[in-house]
């Protein structure tokens, strides 16, 4: 990973397999929702949304390695985007991820609003709409996006890698900036 690298987000298919304890506590124990409750924002029942299969990115990641210079992958699981991405960022570098580059699926907003869950807690527990990150050489970003589009993966550039000194000596390895797009 080098300063200037592009951070590419690949959309999640929903909650994936993380955060169900929080979701259960908020939506069932707290808000009293039933699995068969129709949620207009979902266009289906809560149960159908929660049973959405987790997207598996292995073949997509392998395809990326054949078409562009990939420096790292980060699977966004428990711990959220910032904590998982931080695991691949070397000392001396920093990743900035701009929330304004995507809109989380309605299920994430429902968990937040129904349970008055703060954004920081949601981001530490849920993927917030990003299931996988690829860190690629900047000159390969367009090719990476084209490869993912050809494979039917919704993907976008969500950030970049900089020298940690540019972000402040005591900056975290990853900073989430801005507000989510609506």
UniProtKB/Swiss-Prot annotation:
Recorded superkingdom: Bacteria
Keyword Lipid biosynthesis in annotation: no
GO terms of molecular function: ATP binding; phosphoribosylamine-glycine ligase activity; phosphoribosylformylglycinamidine cyclo-ligase activity
Pathway recorded for this protein: Purine metabolism; IMP biosynthesis via de novo pathway; 5-amino-1-(5-phospho-D-ribosyl)imidazole from N(2)-formyl-N(1)-(5-phospho-D-ribosyl)glycinamide: step 2/2
GO biological process, one term: adenine biosynthetic process
Main localisation: cytoplasm
GO CC field: cytosol
Pfam families hit by this protein: AIRS_C (PF02769)
Enzyme nomenclature, EC number: 6.3.3.1
Catalyses which reaction(s): 2-formamido-N(1)-(5-O-phospho-beta-D-ribosyl)acetamidine + ATP = 5-amino-1-(5-phospho-beta-D-ribosyl)imidazole + ADP + phosphate + H(+)
The family this protein is said to belong to: Belongs to the AIR synthase family.
Name of the protein described by the UniProt record: Putative phosphoribosylformylglycinamidine cyclo-ligase
Provenance organism: Streptomyces fradiae
């Amino acid at each position: 990973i080098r300063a200037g690298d592009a951070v590419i987000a690949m959309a999640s298919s929903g909650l994936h397999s993380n955060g169900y304890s929080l979701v259960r506590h908020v939506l069932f124990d707290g808000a009293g929702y039933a699995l068969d409750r129709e949620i207009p924002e979902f266009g289906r029942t809560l149960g159908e949304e929660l049973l959405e299969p987790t997207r598996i990115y292995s073949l997509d990641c392998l395809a990326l390695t054949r078409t562009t210079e990939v420096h790292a992958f980060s699977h966004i699981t428990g711990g959220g985007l910032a904590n998982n991405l931080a695991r691949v960022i070397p000392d001396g570098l920093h990743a900035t991820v701009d929330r304004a580059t995507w809109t989380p699926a309605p299920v994430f907003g429902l968990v937040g609003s129904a349970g008055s869950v703060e954004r920081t807690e949601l981001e530490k527990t849920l993927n917030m709409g990003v299931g996988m990150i690829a860190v690629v050489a900047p000159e390969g970003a367009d090719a990476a996006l084209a490869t993912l589009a050809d494979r039917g993966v919704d993907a976008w550039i969500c950030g970049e890698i900089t020298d940690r000194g540019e972000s402040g000596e005591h900056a975290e390895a990853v900073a989430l900036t801005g507000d989510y797009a609506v």
